[in-house]
Amino acid sequence: MDLLLLLFSAIWYILPAYIANAVPCILGGGRPVDFGKNFFDGYRLIGNGVTYRGTFFGILFGIITGILQHFIVILYMDPESAFNYGLSGYIILSFLLATGALFGDMLGSFIKRRFKLNQGQSAPLLDQITFIVFALLFAYPFYPLPINTIILLLVISPLIHLSSNIVAYKLHLKKVWW
């Protein structure tokens, strides 16, 4: 497969997870999913950065992304292409990817708290990779990918994540650039 097509296919597949992971930065806030509770080690379970509102809107916008992808395929691509999962397929896939991404983000926050890292402190790769790993784990049993696509996503996702965080920081949507 041509490298450019592989790159496009990988990003197209994972796009609902990327959107779901980005939206809470903009539309989050409110009650944290851990209700402000501490783990037995005395540190927060997850922290204030992961909220019900952010999680809800992350999943919602992930699903909306999947629905838009469906209509883009119908209107602008070959309906017989590998990208055509059908509307229900896109809704299910985008829900799985978005939910997996946000679960991975929560797990990453939980792990950071165990290492006594506060919200906003950098944890290289943990911040950039857990959301993508869990998005893939949630979706893979129903919508499997070839191994070369998975490897590509694991390589490019930290770069895309870092780039988008820098943009969000410059737009004053994030307090730190990482």
Curated annotation (Swiss-Prot):
Transmembrane region positions? 3-23, 56-76, 91-111, 136-156
Enzyme Commission designation: 2.7.7.67
Give the first-level EC class, as a single word.
transferase
Q: Which GO terms describe its biological process?
A: glycerophospholipid biosynthetic process
Catalysis: reaction(s): 2,3-bis-O-(geranylgeranyl)-sn-glycerol 1-phosphate + CTP + H(+) = CDP-2,3-bis-O-(geranylgeranyl)-sn-glycerol + diphosphate
Q: Give an example GO cellular component term for this record.
A: plasma membrane
Is-annotated flag, keyword Nuclease? no
Q: Where in the cell is it found?
A: Cell membrane
Cofactor(s) required, per the database record: Mg(2+)
Pathway stated in the Swiss-Prot or TrEMBL entry: Membrane lipid metabolism; glycerophospholipid metabolism
InterPro entries linked: CarS, CarS_archaea
Q: How does the entry describe its membrane topology? A: Multi-pass membrane protein
| Keyword list, A-Z | Cell membrane, Lipid biosynthesis, Lipid metabolism, Magnesium, Membrane, Phospholipid biosynthesis, Phospholipid metabolism, Transferase, Transmembrane, Transmembrane helix
In alphabetical order, the GO MF annotations are: CDP-2,3-bis-(O-geranylgeranyl)-sn-glycerol synthase activity
UniProt lists the family membership as follows:
Belongs to the CDP-archaeol synthase family.
Q: What does this protein do?
A: Catalyzes the formation of CDP-2,3-bis-(O-geranylgeranyl)-sn-glycerol (CDP-archaeol) from 2,3-bis-(O-geranylgeranyl)-sn-glycerol 1-phosphate (DGGGP) and CTP. This reaction is the third ether-bond-formation step in the biosynthesis of archaeal membrane lipids.
Specify the protein name: CDP-archaeol synthase
Organism whose genome encodes this protein: Methanococcus maripaludis (strain C5 / ATCC BAA-1333)
Q: What gene name is given for the protein in this entry? A: carS
